[in-house]
Amino acid sequence: HLMWLGAYLPDLGLITGFLYGMRDREMFLNLLEIPSGGRLLYNYVKIGGVKRDLPPGFAAKAERVMQTLERRLKEYEDLYDNSKIFRMRTDDVGCYSASDAINWGITGPNLRSAGVAFDLRQADSYDAYPELDFTPVTTSASDGISDCFSRYRQRIDEMYQSMDIVRQALAKMPEGKVMAGSIPVRAKGEAFRRTEDSRGEALMYLVGDGTDRPYR
């Protein structure tokens, strides 16, 4: 969402907004590099677990980063929500209805910005999300209408919610092994899975040939 915001603002004539977004995104790239060793391609999650355990002090570092972002988000809100130029270029611009969004196959924050409370993390209840307390964030310019401003607000609100989800997950993180002892080889077949991504639904398709290496 920070990358989206940083790329979006220069299109509205707010050039410094790009620098603010990239500055704050960098904090999270640094944080994610700690357990994974990578800055953009993390390869941290593996079949059966994760590459390595979180190092001591990681939760405290994550909390400091999130507290900084919370302060910065309030600055963003003061800067953009109250900007006449920003509002002129986003209010009632690029409008579509909730029914349009559904019919067009729009997913993720652009769907929820039309007031549709659909989030795969709850709808499909995968991974540890059933153990976390959250509901889909929604916004809309008016009843069931999305515009450029509501899509901006949707992402701001989702960043606040994401930090709450991360805090819950870190607090509930169990002790113990980070990889399963053995991973059973699956029979030949195929599987399809969808997950919630920052841009909407992410789709995965896997074909197995009966070995421990997927065919595709």
Language-model regions, residue ranges each:
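Active-site bordering "gate/hinge" segments
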Residues: 1-216
